[in-house]
UniProtKB/Swiss-Prot annotation:
This is Beta-ketoacyl-[acyl-carrier-protein] synthase III. The active site is at C113, H250, N280. One of its GO terms (biological process) is fatty acid biosynthetic process. NCBIfam families: fabH, PRK09352.1. The gene is fabH. Transmembrane segments: none annotated. GO terms for cellular component: cytoplasm.
Length: 323
């Protein structure tokens, strides 16, 4: 049985760090207010010359280096983003160009904060189906460019960045002990589309628009939806919460992260948390968190890693991965 095995990880952050103290000078808020409600202490903001594609390409090159591979070894790029450099071509094609690749194929997946789980699931399907052997899976965002910087309820939450993984097809016995993606479950429910959205687009306003969110509504649904899809992944794999070595959640805010871990009975010692340092980077948050946990030695070969996310739409999903 073919499995999609992680060969390397990488990440990239903009140069500018925006602390809560500096945020106090930009909008009517306070460090205490932000930390108590979200757990966020700082975030990174893209500056001139820094784009979704430039950050994504930087993360991709680091992932390739970690894998001991070159762009020539990759035959597919999939980028999860809601903030591409252009309406078209895709961020993935822009990244492909930055990597000097003229072979293979590249495309974007847009599922907002769940985007990286959707992208990993899609890449795994291509690998299992024999359509790709080595895939760059990237989550990259510049959400700072769609924020309403007068809206203190949203502008304090988000940051920019990118993370990337290299997935490679490996033949194995197909047991739960084998390395690679074990199972993934995706969901969406468009009846909630107006609870977290951007109020613009080429087909409606002809403008980029700004992010709008009903925070209480998002929080009300988040923990239950996340827990439900994770339970589906456990049922499909025969694994349980006790088997999980590391939970890597979408870094939305600390309350949602803590609530999901508690509902699943996963101790916080097993949860990778970077929201305090990165803020909510949407589709980039999971690969950024993975990169941190791999670099500091927490995630090791053989570990069972659980990814989960929820985003606008609503979209949500979970993926179990043997590292």
């Amino acid at each position: 049985m073919i499995r999609s095995v992680v060969r390397g990880v990488g990440s990239a952050l903009p140069k500018r760090l925006l602390s809560n103290r500096e945020m106090e000078t930009l909008v009517d808020t306070s460090d205490d207010w932000i930390v108590q409600r979200t757990g966020i202490k700082q975030r990174y903001i893209a500056g001139e010359g820094e784009t979704t594609a430039s950050l994504g390409a930087e993360a991709a090159l680091k992932a390739l280096e970690a894998a001991g591979l070159a762009p020539a070894d990759i035959d597919m790029i999939i980028c999860a983003t809601s903030t591409p450099d252009n309406t078209f071509p895709s961020a993935a094609v822009n990244i492909q160009n930055r990597l000097g690749m003229t072979h293979g194929f590249a495309f974007d997946v847009q599922a907002v904060c769940t985007g990286f789980v959707y992208a990993m699931t899609t890449a795994d399907a291509y690998i299992r189906g024999g359509l790709a052997k080595r895939v760059l899976v990237i989550g990259a965002e510049t959400f700072s460019r769609i924020l309403d910087w007068q809206d203190r309820t949203t502008c304090v939450l988000f940051g920019d960045g990118a993370g990337a993984l290299v997935l490679e097809a490996v033949e194995g016995q197909g047991t739960i002990a084998d390395r690679g993606v074990l199972t993934a479950h995706l969901r969406s429910d468009g009846s909630h589309k107006d609870k977290l959205y951007v109020d613009g687009g080429p087909s409606t306003t002809g403008t980029v628009g700004h992010l709008r969110m009903e925070g209480r509504e998002v929080f009300k649904h988040a923990v239950g939806m996340i827990a439900d899809v994770i339970e589906q992944s456990f049922a499909a794999s025969g694994l349980t919460a006790e088997d999980v070595d590391w939970l890597v959640p979408h870094q939305a805010n600390r309350r949602i992260i803590d609530g999901a871990a508690k509902k699943l009975d996963i101790p916080l010692e097993k949860v990778v948390i970077t929201v305090d340092q990165h803020g909510n980077t949407s589709a980039a948050s999971i690969p950024l968190a993975i990169s941190v946990a791999v670099a500091d030695g927490r995630i090791k070969q053989g570990d069972l890693v659980l990814l989960e996310a929820m985003g606008g739409g609503f979209t949500w999903g979970a993926l179990l991965l043997r590292w």
